[in-house]
């Protein structure tokens, strides 16, 4: 610790308080006469004769009485008319400069009871004392130097009552005193607080004053029965670090001592008498310390600090490394003649105390070997700050550039990539809502083939970078969707109507996407039995809005063929609902709940909701080829599950089962009801591969598939067909006696005990199953009855697509049908 040594003495000021109403009523002469700002006379002599109003005589003849006409000279004398601000300017205001330079400072008020010590230190509301004024001035100076230095302020407030130390900010039991060789006198358990502002510090000071012990006596109605010590600690350090960095630590103590009192004048008894005795004891120890320090005159001598806890706490404030100011408060009335005389005598004695001041500056200098490391750390910090500054400026500049531009709408890729005519200025482009939902998501739409063909033409262009999808503010008019080679010529004067039309089209597309998402979410929640009444009411409200929109539709969209023809959102949602299928495993509970599942949002099935089948078929095949090239189009791996009683069929991807024309064969009579709904008939190849036979005759155990929910067979691998999905329907059971001769003429055993999914396999030519295949399948049946599947997993590379598939109706069977048809065995 580096300290600047400086010699000083205790600064002593005297304040004479105004007379009280009781002293004025007694009509006693004052015993204090203030001569000037530094000198006063105690108990001046009266003239023997003369006018009654004349108090002093110019004649000094005759012997002097002991204690009469004594002249005292101090650093400052305040008369009865002095204000709190005057006392502050000549006491703590001057030592604040030394306090901020790292010197310890102390200000304490000493005097008899009722002399005005507490009023000088604390003041009252509207007329604050030294403690409040010092705090306000300290924070004002700290804020002035805040740009150059960083400060840390801590405060503590305690009292010494009956020779016991108590915390005023956090009241608890009595505390002890310890002496540390480095820190000096410390009080373990004393709370330290860090105020954020001067106002918060004043609130803490007020709260501590309310906890202080005060009791009225005959000498003073608001007598303080304890010594209060308010301490402020300040740490300051330069904000710009250097090789020679210093830390300054200083402490300021503002002390309000209790007044000495005489039992004969206060008439104290009991507890008040014991309090007065302890106060006088601690003040006597303080007087002995002052006398010892005054007699020492810089020499090392014994100072009785340990005679009282008060003197132990004030060890650093009185005779140690501290700049000290003593305020002696006296009364001008002759009723307190002895107390005033003793106060002036001890104050005059304190002037002889010499102090050795040392600035508490802690050097943080580093060794020369650490200079290189410090320089590297500082350079890294500067680089990090510069990078943050550049990032902040770049973000602010980008935000400023985007703010004046109007919002832009996304257009198809064939429009955004069209060249502009030469001579036309192209405006700045910004990335907006790109056409993220083009070909991959358009597969789920049930629109006509023309719209799907347009989507497929734009699908390869989506692999381009996102920058290619940006477009200028003045957008060219798009060509008709039916144009074979769409080209766009930029028009400099595009009217407002085109922009509004594009905006409306984009909004409608966005609404359609949201409704489809809500429809799928409703289906999944209903399948999992997670729907709540609130959610059902919200979906019903959405359904009502969709129905109202379907009656009021009339807007045309150049991008969507369905919207261009004026098709409402309800019908487009209808087409979407048919292509959405669930591809997860099916449990018994889900099969029962989904057996009666219909289209959500209350959208009925209509003939116009389906697109043309003949035109959709080649389009679907083309999309399938595109999706097979993508890695995401591969079938999901089967998840191993616990074996159940029913047999699981392979999970079919959306659109994997082919669709056929409705069969014209006669249906089962109405009296024979199916046990559960079943999908429509499928396209069947020449070779049929069946799954294992279920044990039970129940439709659910036979894996009867709900409307849109196929099941997953974990034991069989198939190469599914690549035809477009068929329209979900609820066909009635088919009379097996009237099945087409093609099916009845086969030699293969056919088990009508359960609905069987027909899959397309790859073979050399479309031929009927042979006897060898039938035998192979019959050898598998014993293993099925034991619950273990022995069907081999055929690699997809060995299966080939047949040249010409034919249709086989796949109806659901009831228990009645199972009795009529038995399993054919050899």
From Swiss-Prot:
GO terms for molecular function: ATP binding; ATP hydrolysis activity; cytoskeletal motor activity; kinesin binding; microtubule binding; plus-end-directed microtubule motor activity. SUPFAM superfamilies: P-loop containing nucleoside triphosphate hydrolases. Pfam families: Kinesin. Gene3D superfamilies: Kinesin motor domain. Residues 610-619 have a biased composition (Basic and acidic residues). CDD domains: KISc_KIP3_like. ATP binds at residues 111-118. The modification Phosphothreonine is found at residue 668. GO terms for cellular component: astral microtubule; cytoplasm; cytosol; kinesin complex; microtubule plus-end; mitotic spindle astral microtubule; mitotic spindle midzone; nuclear body. Residues 411-429, 444-455 have a biased composition (Polar residues). The modification Phosphoserine is found at residues 483, 633, 656, 814. Keywords: ATP-binding, Cell cycle, Cell division, Coiled coil, Cytoplasm, Cytoskeleton, Microtubule, Mitosis, Motor protein, Nucleotide-binding, Nucleus, Phosphoprotein. Residues 9-353 form the Kinesin motor domain. It comes from the Eukaryota. Residues 368-403 form a coiled coil. It is found in: Nucleus; Cytoplasm; Cytoplasm, Cytoskeleton. In complex with KIF2C, constitutes the major microtubule plus-end depolymerizing activity in mitotic cells. Its major role may be to transport KIF2C and/or MAPRE1 along microtubules. Interacts with MAPRE1; this interaction is required for efficient accumulation at microtubule plus ends. Interacts with KIF2C at microtubule tips; this interaction increases the affinity of both partners for microtubule plus ends and is required for robust microtubule depolymerization. KIF2C phosphorylation by AURKA or AURKB strongly reduces KIF18B-binding. Belongs to the TRAFAC class myosin-kinesin ATPase superfamily. Kinesin family. This is Kinesin-like protein KIF18B.
